[in-house]
Amino acid sequence: MKSLRYIAVALFALVATDAMAWTSEVNRAVVMFAEEHLSKRTKSGVEQLLGAPLSSVGFVNEGKSKTRLDESGKSVTTDEKDAVVLLEKAIATLESESATAEERKSALLTAIDMTVDIHCLANILIDKHLEKNFAIFCHNSMQIGFRYYAKKKTNWQRVWHKEYHTSHGAFSAEMYLYDWRIATKGMAKAYKAEPVAPRKWAEQSAKRAFVALGTLQPNAVVENAEVARLEYLNDASLYDASFHLANLLNKTLK
């Protein structure tokens, strides 16, 4: 797996692609929302390491990081290329008093990358249940003869990477933030009290994947409305990604 490289650039000159955990604007919104929940000390620590605020971190795609869970949805992997393992190592480096500034900078970028990736259901693999990408056919309820009208081929990963967000194609990162602030009002305190637990985060993603797999099966023909009803899983993952990233940084950049 090639990891994502990052570059810190001016906020409105963000370099990104739409082939990351989510679309470029959504990824941008995740780090911007996380930044809103950083302490002043953490914001300063991020800027010292990166030379720029968290919200100006750009993603340059070289591949997506995945995490694998066992068939029950437990994270027990020791694979050095697994996103959870990479995140745990990055956290250890950020907490190490002997790490150099360059090592800490690299670890911070990896931590941002992996935290975002393990919250996107497209990057979740589950033994015997979700071992690879698969095709899904979406349609509306109209039929012509024996054929579904406007049947569209998509796939599991695309649903979570893009489908929900392309329906909000005109949304900017700031517009996402406006919605998320309303949707998560009063939640910050509970997130703040949680421990930094990458494996628990991945397991929560797996639980959501299991729910989605009840509807989205390989080569299934699914009503558009059924896919739309699963958007709440994606929304919850986005909120988690932002709050967990903020919590991680607040507790490791001391």
Question: Where do the model's predicted regions map?
Answer:
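Bacterial N-terminal signal peptides that target proteins for export
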Residues: M1-A8
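Hydrophobic, aromatic-enriched interface-forming segments
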Residues: T115-N123
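Short, linear, compositionally biased motifs with a strong N-terminal bias
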Residues: A10-A13, E35
